[in-house]
C-alpha cells in the first residue's frame, strides 16, 4: 500500500512539474532588428489583409460591427472563439503594439505578453510572410481608425480553456518553415503557391 501511495504521489508530482514547466515555458523568437526600419506600403498591406482573411474574420458585419473591431463569433467543436479588435485603439486594439509585437502575433501566434494564441487564428499559415509583408500589413493597419469595442472572452470548456496546453500543441504540430520558391517555375506559379499554402 505504501509503495502504491509513493507511486501515486510521484506521478502527481511529475504531472505538477510538467504543468508548471509548460506554464512558464517561453515561446516565440524575436523578429529581426531590421524590421522596424522597413518602409511599409499601406496599399499593398490592405491587399494582403483582404487576401489573408483579416477583414472577414475581424469584422462582425452581421451585427454592423466596425471594420476590424472584432467580435465575430467562430463556432467550432471546441467552443466559440471571438475575433479580437485589430483597430488602433490602445486599450482594446493593437494601437499600443510595436511592429515587432505585430510580427510575433501574425507569424508566430504569440501575444506581446508572450502567451500563445489559439490556432483559430491561422498564424501557422502566416509564418511564410516576409518581413516586407509584415511591414506592409502594419502600415495598412495603422490607417484603421481606433475603435474601443471590447474584446469578448472565448467560450471554451475543459480542457480547451487551458491556454498553456497550446505550448505542447505548438511543439508537436506547428510548422515554422518559411516559404521556398521553386526556381524551375515562373514567378506567377510561385506567387500562386504562396497564396495557396500560406
Identify the role of each PLM range.
Residues 2-30:
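N-terminal type II signal-anchor transmembrane helix
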Residues 18-23, 98-112, 125-151:
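C-terminal capping alpha-helices of c-type cytochrome domains
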Residues 27-50, 168-196:
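Electrostatic cytochrome c docking/interface patches
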Residues 40, 44, 85, 97, ...:
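Extracytoplasmic/secreted proteins, especially bacterial periplasmic and envelope-associated proteins
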Residues 43, 61-99, 117-131, 155-165:
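Gly/Gly-Pro-rich "capping" loops immediately C-terminal to redox-active cysteine motifs
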Residues 45, 51-61, 102, 137, ...:
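The canonical Cys-X-X-Cys-His
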Residues 57-63, 107-108, 122, 142-143, ...:
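Detector for the c-type heme attachment site
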Residues 112-115, 143-152, 182-194:
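Inter-heme linker and motif-flanking segments adjacent to c-type heme-binding CXXCH motifs
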Amino acid at each position: 500500500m505504501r509503495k502504491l501511495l509513493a507511486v501515486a504521489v510521484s506521478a502527481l508530482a511529475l504531472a505538477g512539474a510538467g504543468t508548471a514547466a509548460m506554464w512558464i515555458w517561453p515561446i516565440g523568437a524575436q523578429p529581426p532588428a531590421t524590421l522596424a526600419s522597413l518602409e511599409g506600403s499601406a496599399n499593398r498591406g490592405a491587399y494582403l489583409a483582404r487576401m489573408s482573411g483579416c477583414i472577414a474574420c475581424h469584422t462582425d458585419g452581421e451585427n454592423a460591427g466596425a471594420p476590424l473591431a472584432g467580435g465575430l463569433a467562430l463556432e467550432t467543436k471546441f467552443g466559440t472563439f471571438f475575433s479580437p479588435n485589430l483597430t488602433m485603439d490602445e486599450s482594446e486594439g493593437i494601437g499600443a503594439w510595436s511592429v515587432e509585437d505585430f510580427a510575433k502575433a501574425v507569424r508566430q501566434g504569440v501575444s506581446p505578453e508572450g502567451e500563445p494564441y489559439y490556432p483559430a487564428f491561422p498564424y501557422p499559415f502566416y509564418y511564410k510572410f516576409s518581413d516586407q509583408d509584415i511591414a506592409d500589413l502594419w502600415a495598412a493597419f495603422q490607417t484603421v481608425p481606433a475603435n474601443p469595442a471590447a474584446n469578448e472572452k472565448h467560450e471554451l470548456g475543459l480542457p480547451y480553456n487551458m491556454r498553456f496546453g497550446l505550448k505542447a500543441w505548438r511543439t508537436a504540430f506547428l510548422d515554422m518553415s518559411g516559404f521556398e520558391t521553386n526556381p524551375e517555375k515562373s514567378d506567377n506559379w510561385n506567387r500562386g503557391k504562396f497564396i495557396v499554402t500560406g
